[in-house]
């Protein structure tokens, strides 16, 4: 983002252009500053978790509210791409978890699903209680991920070559896994190129 910002501002300063061209460059600068802000916020959150500045606070609360909080962050982006989003979650499922940070982790999975699902695609969110865990699954019919890359996607700053055109910095899945792992849970993925992806947050019942 920084190099793109420098290039855009240099062009604005040095090259004569029409008002329409100038407006396009300013929009581009805004996009890059948004990316920079996203990266900064993600790095701050990750650093605070890793250094213990932020301690997760698990309390028994309604998981439906946590899911709703995460969903609210992707509604506009999904509508913009005409992606249909369905949710199947019990309204009275009480679970010991950190609602704020679990919503952050779920939002990161949802955000990825929106980014890598083509316009007009589908995303489904489902919540199921098993004997030992509660599963929050985010499934899409997007690009999919090869089996050889499925472990790597949780590394910090990792991004697959074919998705570099999409916005992102490669830290969302890493942060999501950190949040869930610190609550005694884990994240699993089932995916194949061309067949979409299903990410499941598994949180312990006790």
Language-model-derived ranges and their functions:
Residues 31-36:
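Short alpha-helical segment of the dimerization/phosphotransfer core of two-component systems
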Residues 51-56, 94-98:
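Conserved micro-motifs of the catalytic ATP-binding
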Residues 57-61, 79, 84-94:
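Conserved catalytic submotifs in the C-terminal HATPase_c
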Residues 57-72, 86, 128:
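A conserved beta-strand-to-alpha-helix junction within the catalytic ATP-binding
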Residues 120-132:
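Short beta-strand/loop element within the Bergerat-fold HATPase_c
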Residues 145-157:
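Short conserved segment of the HATPase_c
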Residues 185-186:
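Conserved glycine-rich
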């Amino acid at each position: 983002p920084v190099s793109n910002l420098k290039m855009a501002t240099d062009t604005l300063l040095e090259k004569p252009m029409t008002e329409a061209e100038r407006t396009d460059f300013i929009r581009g600068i805004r996009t890059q500053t948004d990316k920079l802000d996203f990266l900064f916020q993600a790095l701050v959150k990750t650093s605070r978790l890793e250094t213990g500045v932020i301690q997760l606070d698990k309390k028994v609360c309604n998981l439906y509210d946590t899911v709703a909080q995460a969903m609210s962050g992707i509604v506009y982006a999904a509508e913009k791409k005409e992606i249909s989003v369905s949710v199947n979650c019990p309204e009275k499922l009480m679970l010991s978890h950190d609602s704020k940070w679990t919503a952050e982790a779920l939002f990161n999975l949802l955000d990825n699903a929106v980014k890598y699902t083509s316009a007009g695609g589908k995303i489904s969110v489902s919540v199921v209680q098993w004997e030992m865990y509660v599963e929050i699954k985010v499934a899409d019919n997007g690009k999919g991920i090869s089996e050889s890359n499925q472990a790597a996607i949780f590394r910090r700053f990792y991004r697959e070559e074919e998705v570099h055109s999409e916005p992102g910095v490669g830290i969302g899945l890493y942060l999501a896994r950190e949040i869930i792992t610190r609550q005694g849970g884990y994240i699993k993925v089932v995916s194949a190129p061309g067949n979409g992806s299903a990410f499941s947050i598994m949180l312990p019942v006790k």
